[in-house]
């Protein structure tokens, strides 16, 4: 009976395992979680090793959980405590008696592309990892689509700017051409002008038309001849003289013998009104326009017959003298060779 009892005690001793209490902390993003308490069986009679703690954590919290952290133990150093980094085969020294304190710091992986630290995560459930991959894929796809839309919008805006720029350039060119073609603006009726200055201005307009038609026709009068003919026309109405020159006809509508009558008529207008009254308004904007056919002028106030008779009697004495002076000023001797048609 004594031998049986001794053998039973010997068999029971190896079956009894030593278990030590361990307190550990988990550090995530620089913060310590609430402490955890576990009991770790010892694999060696020498004491506790880190591999014993890792095996216990894998059994309790899933395989590979402990590999996500770097472990260190609390040790006394001089008058304080320090964290002592450990590897799998390192021995863990107790703090006081059989008290073990560990800390697990989350391992950080350096991302070479972005230069930032990202935590290494390993999920136990594969379905969650597939969902994460799907989210990442969708996010990347959305980013690519957004980038494509932005590029398309940028190209569209560039095309629109180019399309808008070309009409603006055309409008600017047309505006510049019109400004170059337009001569001095027409003066109002209130500005006093003489008949000679108006005829000279109209003559310059006709000269522009004549210069443009020189390349098309062969037989044309020179600008100097046209100007001389206009000056020699005297007080002849521009409506009668102008169109003949614009049409390229070399024959003038002026008739000899009627010059004195027209001079008297112009003199009456100058004396009665004190300024030139244009019955036919003509402006230049690239071409001659006769606005008399489009607009009707406001009828001017007519003088009474007695007023006209009295005024004509007072001016009768000086009419002939002033007519001769005006004829001398308007009529200039011409060279027959310079003008094709005689006025």
Swiss-Prot record:
A molecular function GO annotation = protein homodimerization activity
Give positions of region: DIX-like oligomerization domain.
18-109
Instruction: Quote the Pfam families the UniProt record gives.
Output: SOK
* Effect caused by changing residue 85 to A: Severely attenuated polymerization
**Tissue localization of expression:** Expressed during embryogenesis and in roots.
List the InterPro entries hit by this protein, alphabetically.
SOK, SOK_DIX, SOK_magnoliopsida
Q: Which UniProt keywords apply?
A: Auxin signaling pathway, Cell cycle, Cell division, Cell membrane, Developmental protein, Membrane, Stress response
Q: Where in the cell is it found?
A: Cell membrane
Query: Superkingdom, according to UniProt?
Result: Eukaryota
Give the Gene3D superfamilies listed for this entry. Answer: SH3 Domains
Q: What else is known?
A: 'Soseki' means cornerstone in Japanese.
Give the family per the record.
Belongs to the SOSEKI family.
Domain remark in the UniProt entry = The DIX-like oligomerization domain is required for polymerization, edge localization and biological activity.
Q: What is this protein called?
A: Protein SOSEKI 4
Q: What is the lineage of its organism?
A: Eukaryota, Viridiplantae, Streptophyta, Embryophyta, Tracheophyta
Q: Please state the gene responsible for encoding this protein.
A: SOK4
């Amino acid at each position: 009976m004594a031998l049986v009892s001794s053998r039973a005690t010997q068999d029971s001793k190896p079956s009894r395992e030593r278990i030590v209490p361990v307190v550990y902390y988990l550090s995530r993003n620089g913060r310590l979680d609430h402490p955890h308490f576990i009991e770790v069986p010892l694999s060696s009679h020498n004491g506790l090793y880190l591999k014993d703690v890792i095996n216990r954590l894998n059994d309790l919290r899933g395989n590979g959980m402990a590999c996500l952290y770097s472990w260190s133990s609390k040790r006394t150093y001089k008058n304080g405590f320090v964290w002592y980094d450990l590897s799998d085969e390192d021995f863990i020294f107790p703090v006081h008696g059989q008290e073990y304190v560990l800390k697990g710091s989350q391992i950080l992986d350096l991302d070479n592309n972005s230069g930032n630290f990202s935590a290494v995560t390993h999920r136990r459930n594969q379905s969650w990892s597939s969902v994460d991959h799907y989210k990442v894929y969708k996010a990347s796809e959305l980013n690519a689509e957004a980038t494509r839309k932005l590029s398309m919008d940028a190209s569209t805006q560039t095309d629109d700017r180019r399309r808008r720029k070309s009409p603006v350039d055309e409008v600017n060119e047309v505006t510049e051409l019109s400004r170059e073609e337009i001569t001095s603006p027409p003066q109002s009726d209130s500005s006093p002008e003489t008949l000679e200055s108006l005829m000279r201005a109209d003559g310059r307009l006709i000269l522009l038309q004549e210069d443009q038609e020189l390349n098309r026709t062969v037989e044309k009068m020179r600008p100097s001849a046209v100007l001389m003919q206009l000056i020699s026309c005297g007080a002849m109405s521009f409506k009668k003289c102008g169109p003949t020159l614009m049409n390229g006809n070399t024959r003038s509508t002026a008739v000899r013998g009627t010059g004195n009558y027209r001079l008297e008529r112009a003199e009456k207008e100058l004396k009665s009104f004190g300024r030139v009254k244009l019955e036919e308004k003509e402006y230049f904007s690239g071409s001659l326009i006769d606005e008399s056919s489009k607009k009707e002028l406001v009828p001017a106030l007519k003088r009474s017959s007695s007023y006209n008779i009295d005024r004509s009697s007072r001016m009768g004495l000086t009419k002939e003298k002033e007519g001769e002076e005006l004829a001398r000023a308007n009529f200039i001797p011409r060279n027959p060779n310079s003008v094709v048609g005689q006025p």
